């Protein structure tokens, strides 16, 4: 049996349900005081606004039904971390490291991921509208059934980037090479790229999407 990244993620999530429930503010204070990692914790129903959560290291943790509004996660590290039904709208994760993480049914509207290293991360059934991923390195990243409308992926380095069933309406890929990325099952319209359209070279689109793109290129099809 072949297991996809998302299937493996669900197996891991089931195991994470058994993690001990922790208070984020309490473990944050301990981590900052002792300069230690936050490991093996489950956080549920946390509500934080404009909180400083920068320079923290989360390992093998789970966030469920948590709200982080305008919070600062800059220069933090997330390894084997799962977010389920969480709201990180307008929060900043700039210059952070994310490895083997999953965002499932999350709201990430306006969230900032600038200058992040993102490896083996999955965004599933999540709203990433207006999120900013400028200058990110995205390796083996999956975007499934998610909304990336008006998101900014400027000057990004994509490697083994996969997407399906997602929306890319007015998304900016300026100076981000999309060669090999298959958008054929996605809703694509009004992509923002450079005047030369070089970002679209060798990307994969459906026939209907090609008609939309021809308008972007100034080509009329009869």
Please tell me what each predicted stretch does:
Residues 14-222:
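Tandem repeat scaffolds
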Residues 1-12:
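N-terminal amphipathic/basic-hydrophobic helices that include classical n-h-c signal peptides
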């Amino acid at each position: 049996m072949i297991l996809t990244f998302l299937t493996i993620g669900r197996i891991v999530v089931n195991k994470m349900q058994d993690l001990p429930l922790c208070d984020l503010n309490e473990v944050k204070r301990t981590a900052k005081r002792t300069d230690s990692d936050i490991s093996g914790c489950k956080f549920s129903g946390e509500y934080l606004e404009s909180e400083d959560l920068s320079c923290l290291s989360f390992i093998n943790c789970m966030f469920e039904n948590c709200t982080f509004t305008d919070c600062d996660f800059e220069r933090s590290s997330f390894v084997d971390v799962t977010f389920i039904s969480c709201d990180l709208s307008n929060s900043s994760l700039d210059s952070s490291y994310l490895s083997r993480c999953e965002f499932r049914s999350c709201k990430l509207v306006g969230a900032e991921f600038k200058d992040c290293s993102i490896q083996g991360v999955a965004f599933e059934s999540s709203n990433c509208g207006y999120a900013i991923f400028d200058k990110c390195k995205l390796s083996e990243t999956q975007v499934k059934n998610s909304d990336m409308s008006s998101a900014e992926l400027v000057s990004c380095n994509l490697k083994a980037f996969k997407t399906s069933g997602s929306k890319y309406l007015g998304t900016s890929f300026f100076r981000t090479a999309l060669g090999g990325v298959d958008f054929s099952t996605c809703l694509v319209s009004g992509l923002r790229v450079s005047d030369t359209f070089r970002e679209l070279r060798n990307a994969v689109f459906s026939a209907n999407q090609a008609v939309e793109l021809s308008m972007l290129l100034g080509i009329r099809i009869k």
